[in-house]
Amino acid sequence: MPHVLSRRQFIATSAVAGIGATRFASWARSAPSATVSIAKCGSYGADLVPTLDRMFGQLGGLGRLVQGRTVGIKLNLTGSPQLRLGGHSAGAAHWVHPRMVGAVVHLMDRAGARRIRLLESPYASAVPLEEYMFQAGWDASDFMGAGARVELENTNGLGRGRDYHRFDVPKGGLLFPSYLLNHSFLDCDTFVSLAKLKDHMTAGVTLSMKNCFGNIPTTIYGDYVKQDEPDLAPRSGRGLLSTPEAASPRASRRRSSIRSHRATRATGCRA
């Protein structure tokens, strides 16, 4: 009997670079059969969803990570939406591919996720994430139609929240003992870094951990943010924190200023 794709199964294409979860109790009770899964898939075509499905199965299945939970997916949309590297679209070059996003949303929804929230802090932009995607030729309604409850949030500022939330760094951190983040990083049970494998002039390579550098809002960690309080809107990138200048007196003043910001301390999740 032929299988007919519904609207919520609209995109039968994708591959995932990395996944992490913040629900450790259930993880400990049901250990995965593997901690890493690697598969070859030659295109963003119809083979990607079954390939992804097998990979998630090798990791113990999506259900134990997402069923009944709110999932935060940090996308990699670094670089201008209008940039065309080698004449390629953003998704075929420096952004995570839109079909990858759609396929992951579809599979997580099928596995029982209660809510899926797509997250990104796009450089110095305060526009809704839907609008930022539109500038690259993406239609955000495709992602929202791939699951029962899908939301998008620009995490460069407060977004739909009223406060930034403080996340402590284990063992004190190297630059900051804690970070102030958008509410979406607290209001999730499972966190996923959906990265794009590419080279990077500062880090050398971008993978799942480097993708999380974009979690920090440029309203607080931007290069030209005021010393005494967060900006209302982002104005610049985070270059000062990703270069040797991070050890400079100016960066030290920024760290002292950020430490003094009042925020709700995050106690409900770990990284």
Map each language-model feature to its residues.
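C-terminal segment of classical bacterial N-terminal signal peptides
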Residues: T22-A25
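Extended, low-polarity segments enriched in aliphatic/aromatic residues
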Residues: W27-A271
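Small side chains
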Residues: G18-G20, G72
